[in-house]
Amino acid sequence: MEEPEMQLKGKKVTDKFTESVYVLANEPSVALYRLQEHVRRSLPELAQHKADMQRWEEQSQGAIYTVEYACSAVKNLVDSSVYFRSVEGLLKQAISIRDHMNASAQGHSPEEPPPPSSA
């Protein structure tokens, strides 16, 4: 009769031991320790990714500003085409008047200068 009783006691001891190991393995402090290990391993890589993303964001913002500025400059040039045409007309008129004055100074009688444009 000793043997079945010893087996029962041995089973109880192993069950208690297994339960103790399970409790120790899943104890909150062990879980927190494992979490801390994970964070310690992962944090440098995550910090590097964050720094990379911030740098890319700054570069993107700079590029966006440059493109917007260039678009604004092109739009302003297109809007000023009226003024360029006006200046061109005034320059042509000034050249014509100069030619007329040079011809008058040389004693020739050139045709009348064109009337000033109202551009």
UniProtKB/Swiss-Prot annotation:
GO biological process: heart development; lysosome localization; organelle transport along microtubule; regulation of endosome size; regulation of lysosome size
Keyword Cytoplasm: no
Statement: the UniProt record of this protein carries the keyword Phosphoprotein: yes
Localisation: Lysosome membrane
Effect of residue 66 to P: In NDOABA; uncertain significance; decreased function in lysosome localization to peripheral cytoplasm; contrary to the wild type, the mutant does not fully rescue defects in lysosomal distribution in BORCS8-deficient cells; reduced interaction with BORCS5 and BORCS7
InterPro entries recorded: BORCS8
Gene Ontology cellular component annotations, sorted alphabetically: BORC complex; cytoplasmic side of lysosomal membrane
Modified residues (Phosphoserine): 109
The entry's keywords: Disease variant, Intellectual disability, Lysosome, Membrane, Neurodegeneration, Phosphoprotein
Family in the record: Belongs to the BORCS8 family.
Assembly with partners or alone: Component of the BLOC-one-related complex (BORC) which is composed of BLOC1S1, BLOC1S2, BORCS5, BORCS6, BORCS7, BORCS8, KXD1 and SNAPIN.
PANTHER family: BLOC-1-RELATED COMPLEX SUBUNIT 8, MEF2B PROTEIN
Disease field: Neurodegeneration, infantile-onset, with optic atrophy and brain abnormalities: An autosomal recessive, severe early-infantile disorder characterized by global developmental delay, severe to profound intellectual disability, hypotonia, limb spasticity, muscle wasting, dysmorphic facies, optic atrophy, leuko-axonopathy with hypomyelination, and neurodegenerative features with prevalent supratentorial involvement.
Function description: As part of the BLOC-one-related complex (BORC), it plays a role in the movement and localization of lysosomes at the cell periphery. Associated with the cytosolic face of lysosomes, BORC recruits ARL8B to the lysosomal membrane and couples lysosomes to microtubule plus-end-directed kinesin motors, driving lysosome movement toward the cell periphery.
The name this protein goes by in its record: BLOC-1-related complex subunit 8
Biological source species: Homo sapiens (Human)
Gene coding for it: BORCS8
